[in-house]
């Protein structure tokens, strides 16, 4: 038993087993109301939804150049460095995590699509009507597979290697969380100002639209 949640590792493991047992090309997992979609590749490996969003954005950009995409701040930084999106003059805006925040920003910016790491994907015209739709998300994945004529494992392996963890939500009292974030922002700003390297990299940008990202 598991929670019908595209971020739930037990659910993804069950879909992975089904993909391998049936020699399937792809596996999809939807939440209870069908507005989120998780993806398992042909080898039974789970793909975090932000990277699926990146692959969909790349595929859409070939037909919809000069488009905007909205992603939440938990999403991969590959959106900012992707050569396909750059070649098609597409812009990515990192925004607040949360269904309502991303949906509103997609419509405000008249973006083609919005992607949240939780699996909420939003599509504007001509792809959708601005709301999150798990079935539409799965269809867009099928489109990119068809257009590239490759296995999903091949497509995902062509992306630069990055390291991610599942979404974590450690407890923090509501009265304390804003102070914790403020203290963390100050610390990160000090590290940036001192040009202290983390994993041999200097901090280039600090994004505080929702917590802190660097």
Sequence positions of predicted segments:
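Catalytic-loop motifs flanking and including active-site residues across diverse enzymes
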Residues: 11, 49-56, 133-137, 141
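N-terminal small/polar loop signature for handling phosphorylated ligands or for N-terminal nucleophile
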Residues: 1-39
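Buried hydrophobic positions in well-ordered alpha/beta secondary-structure cores of metabolic enzymes
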Residues: 12-16, 28, 33, 57, ...
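Short glycine/threonine-rich catalytic loop with a Thr-x-Gly-x-Asp
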Residues: 6, 30-32, 46-51, 127-134
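Short Gly/Thr/Asp-enriched flexible loops that form oxyanion-binding sites at enzyme active sites
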Residues: 35-54, 80-82
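Phosphate-binding and adjacent anionic-ligand microenvironments
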Residues: 64-214
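Self-splicing inteins and homing endonuclease
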Residues: 26-27, 32-44, 106-115, 212
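Short, acidic/small-residue loops that bind anionic groups at enzyme active sites
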Residues: 45-66, 96-97
